[in-house]
Each structure stands twice: as structure tokens, then as C-alpha cells.
Amino acid sequence: LIPIEVNIMKIKAVVFDAYGTLFDVYSIQVLAEAFYPGNGADIAAKWRDKQIEYTRLITQSDPHNATGSRFFRPFWELTRLSLEYTLDRLALDRKSGQVEKLMQQYAHLTPFPENLAVLQQIKAMGLTTAILSNGSVEMLTSAVKSAGMADVLDHLLSVDPIRLFKTSPESYGLVQQNMAVNKDEVLFVSSNGWDVLGATWFGFTTHWVNRQGLPFEALSPQPHFSGPDLHSVLHSLGTISNPPIPNQI
């Protein structure tokens, strides 16, 4: 654990990122490989990178508009455009039927296996649970229902109302706007280093789910907590007594 002073006993809500944290964005490569043999992993990686690049471009190009970025497009639309670009970049045929099937698969991404048990334990502690995501409410609702997690998540928060994506301060501010909590009462959980940085800068206590065993970003600050999967969130909350997880920061 990083020796940053934080009172974990003040935590009232645990807020999760969705894509990459609760849902495996790279699970799409199985279907992509079936459609485009030898290209599945490359499609999944480039698709995800372009998707995030588009969100940053939109937010950074018009960050001070009171009604959100005038360039804003819903995450679902950006996901489709990112897929189309990826296929074009790899010189692969954009057959409409295959694009539609990949998009539908994205709406029902594979959840990580520990999700439900961990969320149930967090709820049993009396804590509020939520998702904060670039995804639309419709996307999140579909993914959560298909994963059987609707009963263990109290809030599904989308950036759509503010028309600014993460890591804008306004995106993290949605937590306080929609939940009766202060910044220091929130544990924010994400597998994306850039998301953890944004949330830490905003003032949340943060937990980085380091599923790939990577070094954290060179840019500071470091996350308050880290571990290899969602079970480590329980460790951070003090609900289990285990020795330090080997690949914690």
C-alpha cells in the first residue's frame, strides 16, 4: 500500500469504473478473431485505444463550455466509430453484419468472475455502490443486467448529462451531485491508470485494480491502494485480514 494518509473508516461509498474494471473490454477479441482470423487481439486493443482517444479529444477541445463539449457524441456512437476506424486501419472488410454483431457483443461484455461476490460483500458492509462511466445509462444497464449485478449496484452514473468525458473534474463531480457523500467518503476503483489519476486529483480515495501486473504511471500521485483484482478492494476496506498482496504497489 502507498503510505498516503487516508481514513478508510470514513468511506461511505465505493464507486467503480465500468469498462476494464467490471467488464473485460478485451473479451471482444474472441468474436473478432472468429470474424477476422489472426486479428482478434489487435482489433480489441486498437478499438479500445481509439475509443478512449476520441473521448479525450472531445473533452479537451471544448473543456470550458457551460453546457458541455459542443463536440460531444455518446459513448456508444464513439465505440462504433472506433471499431470502424480500427477495421479500416487494419485493412479489414467492414461487413455491416459483422460490425453489428461486434457492437452487440460490446453491449454484453464478459464480467470479471469475482465481481458479484465482491459487490455483495461491500453491500453487506452497509456501503453504497455505484458505477461512474463514460458509457450511457443504456449501455451500463444492459451490461449490468446481463452480468446479474443489478441488485448490488445502487447507482449507474453516466457522463451523458454533462457532455464531458473522464478525466474532466465535472465527470467525477457527478458522484457528489447524485449521491449524498463528500469527496473523502468515496473509494473510487478503476483498472485504468489515467482514470485513477484523474480521480485522485479530484480528491477521491483511489484503488487501482492492476489486472495486468503493470507499473503505475510515472506521473504522480500514486493511488492510495492497489491490488490484482476486485478482491483487493475488500482488503483495502479492511474486511479481510491477508498478508500484503505481492503485486501491490
Task: Please report, for each region that a protein language model flagged, where it lies by residue.
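A short acidic, helix-capping loop that chelates divalent metal ions and anchors anionic groups
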Residues: 31, 54-60, 139-141, 215-218
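Short, acidic loop-to-helix structural element flanking the phosphoryl-transfer center
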Residues: 72, 76-80, 92-131, 141, ...
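Short, Lys/Arg-enriched N-terminal segments with co-localized hydrophobic residues
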Residues: 1-8
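Alpha-helical elements of Rossmann-like donor-binding domains used by nucleotide-donor carbohydrate transfer enzymes
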Residues: 30-31, 46, 81-85, 101, ...
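Asp-based, Mg2+/Mn2+-dependent phosphohydrolase catalytic module
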Residues: 9-14, 120, 132, 136-249
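Active-site neighborhood of HAD-like aspartate-dependent phosphohydrolases
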Residues: 9-52
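A metal-dependent, Asp-based hydrolase signature
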Residues: 41, 49, 54-100
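Short helix-capping segments at alpha-helix termini
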Residues: 36-40, 89-94, 124, 148-152, ...
